[in-house]
Amino acid sequence: MKLKSFALTSLTFCFAAICGTPSVQAATLTTIVNGISNARAVSFGPDSSLYVAEPGIGGNGNCQPSPSTLFQPICAGNSGSLVKVASDGTTQRLFNNFESIAEQPSGNQGAGIQDVQFDSQGNAYLLTGFAGYPGNRDLESLNLGANFPIPEQQLVTFPPSTPDKVLNTPLLAQLFKADLNTGKLESIFDFGKYEITNNPDGGDVVTNPFDLTVSGDTAYVIDGGGNTAYKIKLDGSESEAIAIPKKVLSASTLPPLPPGQELPPGLVEVLPGGNIAIQSVPTGGTIGPDGALYVAEYSGFPYPENESRIFRIGDDGNPEVFLDGFTQITDLTFDEQGNLLVLQFGDESQLQGDLRFLPGSLIKVAPDLTRTTLVAAGEGLESSAGIDIGPDGKIYITKRGVGPELGSVVRVDNVVTERVPEPTSILGLLALASVGATGAIAKRKRQNKLSEELLAKAEIV
């Protein structure tokens, strides 16, 4: 069951429960924009404008059960947008009333516009999510899905819709070349159709494209529903799908159930010897200093703490574990010094608290693999979803990524931290330390500095 709650302390850092990584001084978080519904990625355009993906809150249209919400219905509407904050601080919504699906009546766990990124010529590319069986998207995909198999457990928990109950959201689960001035969209890749016809990880047939990175002539898309990383030529001429493997854990990590209740079929894979295999649910991707793709995972039910991994995918297309011991990662990026910045949605399992306000954190992994907590749990990064480095070289993060109008983008300032050596990782040392800071490739193309007008409108929180 491909689970992404959102849709979406520590074996981390030298086993932080033993070593500890307290911040000497709490970082200052400066609010740039707020009032975003189910906020996702943050990015910067060629003119230094800031963009925030707003999947929306669904609506009163047709519904489908979703693995993203542990099979609770998510319903369609037109409430999504792309929020633009210009360099003078002016805010506007592009693609307003875009297709959206979310829980009702709460409006939580939205899927819609997920990310926007730009190539070196300034062209914009828009990614949309879905969070369910792609055959339910519209009549065309439903008819396509009728020709391909669906696992038995999926038929029990989130089956295909009937023709009169499809969501009528044909723009979801796609990658587009986008004209931000006219609103014109040109489809480059349809993840819904690809998942139906290919099912790269061999599990449930479900898709939820979550993260986009553009580098050179290639788009890199991380599909948290399909447990897959994609490499797609921007002209649509070639594509490659790389399945991200499950993680094997002791069955003792499963939470106790009330008497008489059982886990829904397919929620976890039960293995011999008292073990289980859980979904990876990858959520973030970035290109490293070595040119490889780095993929972060959130992990599926039961969302165990300290078990999320970061994979490195080189030219051979084989995902190898680069780092382990994180909790519910939603995004990552490299800065100009070659440090890997890792954003944790919550430092505790989402089963332990309110999904809207989990204590998230920001971790820096240096080229020598030293891990440092830049913003610790409880210091203001609740349920954080996206990260980028701004034109001013500072870190920008979307927080409170679940719920209507709760989301915001904050800038991270005044970071003073302790450093804790990372346990030996030969792979990591070879991959990063030998490259050096001068070779660092940031996730998104850096633009000119933000204007003083935008920063002047920021609010210290």
Model-predicted regions and their roles:
Residues 438-461:
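C-terminal membrane-anchoring or membrane-association module
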